[in-house]
């Protein structure tokens, strides 16, 4: 009996051992381009009535220096446009290390389009801090090239600044801060970015790192209705079953690491990222295109989002 069971037990052991290997293999070959469109409807009592049903598409963490499949990336850009949102908001990390990584993809991402334009902010990887430069002048030139590139692509880059989207006699404020992260560059100046806006404006804040929401935004005197972040990538590894399981090792580093959170009557969305970095794949945490619809109304247990 034992001789007959050993081959079966061996086969089971091999099968179990193969699961992580196959998962990683899938993540490298397919998962990193397995784009998912995640849709949320968010309710705000003080949303200006002219913006009822207003649609925002958020993308984050493009990391163009990692891409190796032009067709897949073009498909994803087309998928963003197919959402037909009123505005596109990009929350940083266009590149891995230097601006030139984006040059082969400039035309592709220049095809992004939305009625009210594209707003963007910088992430920690967009400053050229993760590469050794021959001189400070070369690093400064790289940064200036980043600013120029975003403008040429049609991105309205907000460097501690704010713009308004106007509909009839009502408006919403779009505020963008430079990178501010716990343990990372803390260049962003929320006070400066918000200096143009009124306290009663409906506010959408773009801030690359969700730790900024936790450590500064929630404590600020102004009420930021909706904050959009990225940065974590959900660690590109985890398990998500909607309504049942949401887990990634990144949870031990970031309290807010993927999806929608609500605190102090303010809402944060952490996008899982469009691209990938370091590990050349994604396992269980797929590249994300977020579509948010704004609705006027009171949030309760049945319609928080």
Regions found by a protein language model. Give the residues of each.
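N-terminal signal-anchor transmembrane helix
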Residues: 1-16, 26-59, 65-83
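Soluble catalytic domains of enzymes that build or remodel membrane lipids, polysaccharides, and related
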Residues: 47-305
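Membrane-embedded alpha-helical transmembrane segments of multi-pass integral membrane proteins
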Residues: 20-23
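N-terminal presequences and immediately downstream first alpha-helices
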Residues: 11-18, 225, 234
């Amino acid at each position: 009996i034992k001789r007959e069971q050993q081959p079966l037990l061996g086969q089971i052991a091999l099968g179990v051992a193969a699961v992580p290997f196959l998962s990683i293999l899938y993540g490298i070959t397919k998962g990193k381009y397995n784009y998912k469109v995640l849709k949320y409807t968010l309710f705000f009592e003080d949303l200006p009535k002219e913006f009822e049903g207003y649609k925002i598409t958020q993308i984050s963490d493009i990391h163009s220096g990692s891409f190796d499949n032009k067709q897949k990336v073009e498909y994803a850009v087309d998928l963003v446009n197919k959402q037909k949102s009123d505005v596109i908001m990009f929350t940083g990390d266009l590149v891995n290390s230097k601006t030139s990584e984006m040059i082969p993809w400039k035309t592709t991402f220049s095809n992004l389009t939305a009625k009210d334009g594209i707003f963007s902010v910088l992430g920690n990887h967009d400053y050229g801090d993760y590469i050794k430069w021959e001189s400070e002048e070369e690093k400064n030139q790289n940064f200036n090239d980043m600013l120029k590139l975003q403008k040429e692509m049609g991105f309205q880059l907000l460097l501690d600044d704010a713009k308004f989207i106007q509909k009839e006699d009502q408006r919403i404020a779009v505020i963008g801060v430079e990178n501010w992260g716990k343990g990372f560059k803390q260049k962003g100046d929320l006070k400066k970015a918000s200096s143009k806006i009124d306290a009663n404006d409906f506010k959408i804040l773009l801030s690359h790192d969700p730790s900024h929401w936790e450590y500064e935004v929630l404590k600020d005197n102004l009420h930021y209705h909706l904050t959009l972040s990225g940065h974590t990538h959900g660690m590109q590894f985890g398990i998500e079953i909607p309504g049942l399981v949401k887990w990634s090792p990144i949870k031990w580093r970031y309290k807010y690491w993927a999806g929608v959170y609500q605190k102090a009557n303010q809402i944060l969305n952490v996008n899982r990222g469009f691209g990938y970095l370091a590990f050349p794949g994604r396992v269980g945490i797929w590249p994300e295109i977020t579509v948010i619809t704004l609705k006027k109304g009171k949030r309760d247990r049945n319609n928080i989002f």
